[in-house]
Amino acid sequence: MPKMKTHRGAAKRFKKTGSGKLKYDRAYGSHLFANKSTKQKRHLRKANIVSSGDFKRIKSLLVYMK
Protein backbone atom coordinates (compact mmCIF):
# COMPACT_ATOMS: atom_id res chain seq x y z
CA MET A 1 0.00 0.00 0.00
CA PRO A 2 1.43 3.44 -0.87
CA LYS A 3 2.32 5.97 1.77
CA MET A 4 -0.37 8.44 2.77
CA LYS A 5 0.30 12.04 1.79
CA THR A 6 0.10 15.02 4.08
CA HIS A 7 -2.24 17.74 2.84
CA ARG A 8 0.31 20.51 2.19
CA GLY A 9 -2.21 23.33 2.54
CA ALA A 10 -3.21 22.09 5.99
CA ALA A 11 0.42 21.52 7.01
CA LYS A 12 1.18 25.19 6.35
CA ARG A 13 -1.83 26.42 8.34
CA PHE A 14 -1.89 24.29 11.49
CA LYS A 15 0.68 23.74 14.25
CA LYS A 16 0.41 21.36 17.17
CA THR A 17 0.51 22.75 20.71
CA GLY A 18 2.25 21.10 23.64
CA SER A 19 -1.02 19.66 24.90
CA GLY A 20 -1.82 18.08 21.52
CA LYS A 21 -4.36 20.60 20.24
CA LEU A 22 -4.09 22.29 16.85
CA LYS A 23 -3.70 26.05 16.56
CA TYR A 24 -4.04 28.30 13.55
CA ASP A 25 -3.98 31.99 12.64
CA ARG A 26 -7.30 33.72 12.11
CA ALA A 27 -8.51 34.95 8.74
CA TYR A 28 -8.52 38.64 7.73
CA GLY A 29 -5.20 39.37 9.42
CA SER A 30 -2.77 40.02 6.58
CA HIS A 31 -3.67 43.38 4.99
CA LEU A 32 -6.29 46.16 4.65
CA PHE A 33 -5.88 47.15 8.30
CA ALA A 34 -7.01 50.74 7.78
CA ASN A 35 -10.59 49.45 7.48
CA LYS A 36 -10.43 47.44 10.71
CA SER A 37 -10.94 48.66 14.26
CA THR A 38 -8.18 48.46 16.87
CA LYS A 39 -10.19 45.85 18.76
CA GLN A 40 -10.54 43.66 15.67
CA LYS A 41 -6.81 43.91 14.90
CA ARG A 42 -5.94 43.04 18.50
CA HIS A 43 -8.11 39.92 18.41
CA LEU A 44 -6.59 38.88 15.07
CA ARG A 45 -3.11 38.77 16.65
CA LYS A 46 -4.03 35.84 18.86
CA ALA A 47 -4.02 32.34 17.38
CA ASN A 48 -7.15 30.19 17.59
CA ILE A 49 -7.57 26.55 18.63
CA VAL A 50 -9.33 24.04 16.37
CA SER A 51 -12.74 23.06 17.74
CA SER A 52 -13.40 19.50 18.83
CA GLY A 53 -15.85 19.00 15.97
CA ASP A 54 -13.23 19.82 13.34
CA PHE A 55 -10.25 18.19 15.05
CA LYS A 56 -10.72 14.67 13.66
CA ARG A 57 -11.21 15.92 10.09
CA ILE A 58 -8.13 18.13 10.15
CA LYS A 59 -6.03 15.47 11.88
CA SER A 60 -6.76 13.11 8.97
CA LEU A 61 -5.17 15.66 6.61
CA LEU A 62 -2.03 15.77 8.78
CA VAL A 63 -1.32 12.05 8.89
CA TYR A 64 2.31 12.28 10.07
CA MET A 65 2.00 15.12 12.57
CA LYS A 66 3.29 13.81 15.86
Curated annotation (Swiss-Prot):
A GO molecular-function annotation: structural constituent of ribosome
Classification via InterPro entries: Ribosomal_bL35, Ribosomal_bL35-like, Ribosomal_bL35_CS, Ribosomal_bL35_sf
Matching Gene3D superfamilies: 4.10.410.60
Ribosomal protein is among the record's keywords: yes
The entry's keywords: Ribonucleoprotein, Ribosomal protein
Keyword presence, Oxidoreductase: no
Biological processes annotated in GO: translation
Domain of life from the UniProt record: Bacteria
PANTHER family with a match to the protein in the record: 54S RIBOSOMAL PROTEIN BL35M (PTHR33343), LARGE RIBOSOMAL SUBUNIT PROTEIN BL35M (PTHR33343:SF1)
Similarity section: Belongs to the bacterial ribosomal protein bL35 family.
UniProt protein name: Large ribosomal subunit protein bL35
Provenance organism: Lysinibacillus sphaericus (strain C3-41)
Gene, per the UniProt record: rpmI
